[in-house]
């Protein structure tokens, strides 16, 4: 199982562990260790502790650098959405981690690999193990592959109102006329999609799509704000 995991990590993420035992530890639950006491195995809780701290740090640093004018309160809410149990469990599933977790027989029968709490732990423990094995840069590369693209995909749009955030940013030094214009709508009434552009003083600064005008406006505002922050 760990051999297959190592092969997957190499193929998908270019990650090769120097210490295979550390990788195995990150994917081993206590129930498995208890059933294999003759093998002197370790389980994931200690590296999970480290991974939790590493993830909060790298996500905090990324948000601080990317959103240079975002207030602390909004940064905190966005970070909380990115480093929560639900998000980490989702990332673990997208990485196909569940099938590689070593569980005791009882936990296997209970389908423990489906629990968000366990998948969150495994995601954190993997990052902790990667940090111990190779340091900060490989961790940054991994989260740039797995976590940060979700910002541009709109995964965390529900955390705050991008239209308000964009307005506050554009008008911080004075009045700016902000307008949202419908470019195109497509599809039948029950499946209609909308393309909307956002303009600042008549100049297009972003565009977005959605299944409602409100969703498309939020998408356009998010794209515009992200692009402005990167200038």
Curated annotation (Swiss-Prot):
Subunit details for this protein? Homodimer.
The protein's superkingdom reads Bacteria
Q: Where is this region: Disordered?
A: 209-231
Q: Where is the DRBM domain?
A: 161-230
Species for this entry: Lactiplantibacillus plantarum (strain ATCC BAA-793 / NCIMB 8826 / WCFS1) (Lactobacillus plantarum)
So which cofactors does this thing need? Mg(2+)
Record keywords? Cytoplasm, Endonuclease, Hydrolase, Magnesium, Metal-binding, mRNA processing, Nuclease, RNA-binding, rRNA processing, rRNA-binding, tRNA processing
Which Gene Ontology terms of cellular component type are present? cytoplasm
Which GO terms label this protein's molecular function in UniProt?
double-stranded RNA binding; metal ion binding; ribonuclease III activity; rRNA binding
First-level EC class: hydrolase
State whether keyword RNA-binding applies.
yes
Record field: catalytic activity:
Endonucleolytic cleavage to 5'-phosphomonoester
Q: Which residue numbers delimit the RNase III domain?
A: 6-135
- Which coarse location class applies to the principal site listed for this UniProt protein? cytoplasm
What is the name listed in the Swiss-Prot or TrEMBL entry for this protein?
A: Ribonuclease 3
Subcellular location as annotated: Cytoplasm
Gene Ontology annotations of biological process type: mRNA processing; regulation of gene expression; rRNA processing; tRNA processing
